[in-house]
Amino acid sequence: MSRQWNFLSNHGLIILHLVSNPRATLREIALATGLTERAVYQIVRELEEGDFIDKRKVGRRNAYTINRRNILEHPAYGDRTIADVGKTIMGLD
């Protein structure tokens, strides 16, 4: 029996979801990614603290902006940014 695995981490799934759906609620993100709302809440907080996303209030909802110029801090990535990864995976400009 083979184990199921994801190509992207949960953090990556949430970032990619927010690229297309910047005003998604935590519940909507959870439903789209298959994660619990609690896990999504924690990951969104970590992404904010790591300066990967910015959150702002729009009416009664939050809207998220991806910091596309944020450099990924890992030797394997070199100077690649979130935008570079998005272009590769989703064909983003």
What do the predicted segments below correspond to?
Residues 3-11, 25, 57-78:
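Short, cationic-aromatic polyanion-contact patches
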Residues 12-16:
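Pre-recognition alpha-helix immediately N-terminal to the DNA-recognition helix
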Residues 48-58:
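A short, conserved structural fragment
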Residues 38:
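Key DNA-contact positions within bacterial/archaeal DNA-binding proteins
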Residues 28-31, 48-49:
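Alpha-helical residues within the helix-turn-helix
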Residues 44-45:
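Short, hydrophobic-biased segments on the C-terminal half of alpha helices
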Residues 17-21:
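Short amphipathic alpha-helical elements of helix-turn-helix/winged-helix folds
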Residues 71-93:
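Amphipathic alpha-helical dimerization/coiled-coil segments
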